[in-house]
Amino acid sequence: MTRYSSKSWRTFQPRTAAGAAGAAAAGPVAAPAPSSISLVAHDCRVLGLDPGSQRTGYGIIDCRGGSERHVASGCVDVVGHDMGVRLQRIYAAVSALVVEHQPDSVAIERVFVHRNPDSALKLGQARGVALCAAASLGASVHEYAPRAIKLAVTGYGAAGKPQVAQMVRTLLLLEIKLAADAADALAVALCHAQTRRLGALDAIDVA
């Protein structure tokens, strides 16, 4: 399906370590603003997800050749609800994003070992429903290690969250401040775009 956009494109390239040094939604996910409607056909649309038991970040980018453009991003806030309701809302929100934006690929951060067993379990549940929602709608789902994501965006695998967020804004020409979870989700999407472009899709395919 061809989509179009009026926003400018930005070439996305891996950053060196030296160079790198330099709105919540609790219900249905809103449709993108009219300004995100396209005038230039793109090759691939990627939905990046940063699932969590309290809030889930999402970021959508369009890729054309060696360039990426921001389409939409934000957070699904489920704080204050029982776990069952949280998971249902995450599932519904991810499903709505896939239906609304029709991504060609969905990218998600690979789970890491957590010191707190209870937190690890809740994170796993949130990731599970997000993956299930995307896969059940036929999306191609890929996982990336946290270090690989940081390396792709900043050129430094141990970069901190502020550094990653700043590079995401720079690469996508964003003047707005991003919520931490939304920035992380966009970073995952950019990592997938770079991996796809390099022809080295070594992420773990889960769908």
What are these regions (language model features)?
Residues 1-207:
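Phosphate- and other anionic-substrate recognition elements at nucleic-acid/protein interfaces
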